[in-house]
């Protein structure tokens, strides 16, 4: 751990049942009068966008419009079209209702509508934003990305096909709403994948080189909430308390990794997802125990501490101290087996349908250049990365 650290997360959380009903007054207190509601067609079809628009109208903050033309892999062209419409409607704020793509799109739209200009790429990279942006409220409909409390947005450049990062503390939303009604209808396979994404955020934040006491506390609580709620929600998907626990776990993990970063699981997962077009949470689930085992013994003390939030006090106390690191990895494998049996969340690349073994070298070559490797406690060269990929194959 670094001798110096800083921690920053100014996002105000509105959490619990009826949290949605608090949003209008909170947004109005930020000076919002005419918000544009951004979502995607899938979320809009569930009626959640209409529900949110009605709640805002009842709070005397009607939306100017609902824009649902946001694809799963949003682009600069999409952002620039929305920014143009925002200006035409004379909007002054944004509400993002959806998952990671919708939230990242809203952050990017907020760049253009606050900073000016028509070309999003003018603001790419880090440190290009020079002042606070207009009010942005994020209402997640999945519990996994933690994007509601991160200072990053990733948008595809349509011209080159590459994914472009935008990084600034000014990208953080002012408000985030965690209301269990918003995730009750989430299919169980997506619930499981996004929860394992959040679990990986928390664990990698806790074992990485940039960890600090504040992010540690958040990460441990995130692991506890996710490990407790996820196996139960498979059998009780409408349970509001369990849905809220997963949402809280995702947000806590987002706060942790936004300040402490992620590691090798993400480096491999980013690369597999990009090459084989697999969902991010699925990729995290594939690699998590394999990478934790690789990182031993450098992270054994952290792995031992993770056993308590993963399995509870009784099993933790019954496990000899020298066996706790291994028991943590076993507990994660057991959770993955449970999810495979319940919703067929793949544990290996072959279960995920990756049939061409020659792709492993391509995935390795992408992973070796991923920035997340910088925060992993144990270095990995090309040969070691290929070995890890082969272990995750079957």
Task: For the regions a language model picked out, list residue spans one by one.
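Flexible, glycine/charged-enriched surface loops at secondary-structure junctions
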Residues: 210-218, 233-245, 260-265, 318-322, ...
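Mobile late-domain/C-terminal helix-loop "cap" segments
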Residues: 289-394
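Glycine-rich phosphate/pyrophosphate-binding beta-alpha loops
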Residues: 144, 251-284, 370-374
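Glycine/threonine-rich beta-strand-loop-alpha-helix active-site module
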Residues: 77-181
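Carboxylate- and glycine-rich phosphate/diphosphate-binding segment that chelates Mg2+/Mn2+
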Residues: 152-260
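ATP/NTP phosphate-donor binding region
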Residues: 1-93
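Short glycine/serine/threonine-rich phosphate/pyrophosphate-binding segments
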Residues: 20-23, 45-48, 76-79, 101-106, ...
């Amino acid at each position: 751990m670094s001798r110096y650290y800083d921690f920053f997360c100014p996002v105000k959380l509105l959490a619990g049942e009826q949290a949605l009903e608090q949003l209008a007054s909170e947004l109005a207190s930020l000076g919002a009068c005419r918000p544009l509601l951004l979502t995607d067609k899938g979320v809009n079809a569930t009626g959640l966008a209409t529900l949110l628009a009605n709640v805002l109208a009842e709070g005397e903050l009607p939306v100017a419009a609902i824009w649902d033309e946001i694809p799963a892999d949003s682009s600069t062209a999409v952002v620039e079209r929305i920014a143009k419409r925002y200006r035409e409607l004379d909007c002054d704020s944004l509400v993002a209702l959806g998952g990671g793509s919708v939230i990242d799109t809203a952050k990017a739209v907020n760049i253009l509508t606050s900073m000016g200009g028509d070309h999003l790429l003018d603001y790419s990279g880090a440190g290009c934003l020079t002042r606070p942006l207009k009010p942005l409220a994020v209402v997640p409909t999945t519990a996994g990305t933690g994007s509601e409390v991160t200072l990053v947005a990733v948008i595809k450049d349509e011209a080159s096909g590459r994914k472009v990062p935008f990084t600034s503390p000014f990208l953080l939303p002012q408000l985030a709403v965690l209301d269990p009604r918003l995730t009750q209808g989430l299919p169980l396979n997506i619930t499981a994948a996004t929860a394992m994404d959040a679990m990986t955020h928390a664990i990698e934040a806790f074992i990485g080189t940039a960890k600090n006491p504040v992010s540690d506390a958040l990460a441990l609580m995130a692991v506890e909430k996710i490990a407790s709620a996820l196996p139960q929600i498979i059998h009780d998907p409408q349970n509001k308390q369990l849905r809220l626990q997963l949402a809280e776990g995702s947000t806590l993990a987002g706060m942790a990794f936004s300040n402490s970063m992620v590691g090798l699981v993400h480096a491999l997962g980013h690369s597999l997802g990009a090459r084989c077009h697999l969902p991010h949470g699925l990729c995290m689930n594939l690699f998590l125990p394999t990478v934790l085992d690789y990182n031993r013994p450098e992270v054994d003390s952290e792995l031992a501490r993770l056993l308590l939030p993963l399995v509870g006090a009784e099993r933790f106390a019954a496990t000899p101290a020298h066996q706790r690191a291994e028991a943590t990895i076993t507990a994660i494998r057991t959770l993955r087996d449970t999810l495979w049996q319940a919703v067929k969340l793949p544990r290996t690349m072959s279960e995920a349908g990756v049939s061409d073994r020659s792709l492993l070298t391509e995935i390795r070559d992408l992973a070796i250049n991923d920035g997340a490797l910088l925060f992993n406690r144990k270095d990995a060269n090309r040969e070691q990365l290929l070995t890890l990929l082969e272990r995750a194959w079957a």
